[in-house]
């Protein structure tokens, strides 16, 4: 179920402050965040965020198409090891 419109998008307070500080500084550095639940806002376009996936921070460069999505959508948490090899085919 979608979030009701009267509430507006959810963004952690510290995240908004970090983005504003990074926008003001001249050097471009990765902003480390743990808030995968936060919505990407238009103010974040052009910034690089390090989104935590449980082990490490995955760098995510925010583009216009990402606005309205959540940060967690762009940082996968599970690694797919592949399907098990067929033992019969391996012996041949």
Swiss-Prot record:
A cellular-component GO term for this protein: small ribosomal subunit
GO biological process assignments: ribosomal small subunit assembly; translation
Gene3D superfamilies: 30s Ribosomal Protein S19, Chain A
Keywords for this protein: Ribonucleoprotein, Ribosomal protein, RNA-binding, rRNA-binding
InterPro entries per record: Ribosomal_uS19, Ribosomal_uS19_bac-type, Ribosomal_uS19_CS, Ribosomal_uS19_SF
Gene Ontology MF annotations: rRNA binding; structural constituent of ribosome
Disulphide bridges, residue numbers: none
One Pfam family in the UniProt entry: Ribosomal_S19
Recorded superkingdom: Bacteria
Biological role: Protein S19 forms a complex with S13 that binds strongly to the 16S ribosomal RNA.
PANTHER family in UniProt: RIBOSOMAL PROTEIN S19P FAMILY MEMBER (PTHR11880), SMALL RIBOSOMAL SUBUNIT PROTEIN US19M (PTHR11880:SF8)
Homology family: Belongs to the universal ribosomal protein uS19 family.
Protein name: Small ribosomal subunit protein uS19
Organism: Methylobacterium radiotolerans (strain ATCC 27329 / DSM 1819 / JCM 2831 / NBRC 15690 / NCIMB 10815 / 0-1)
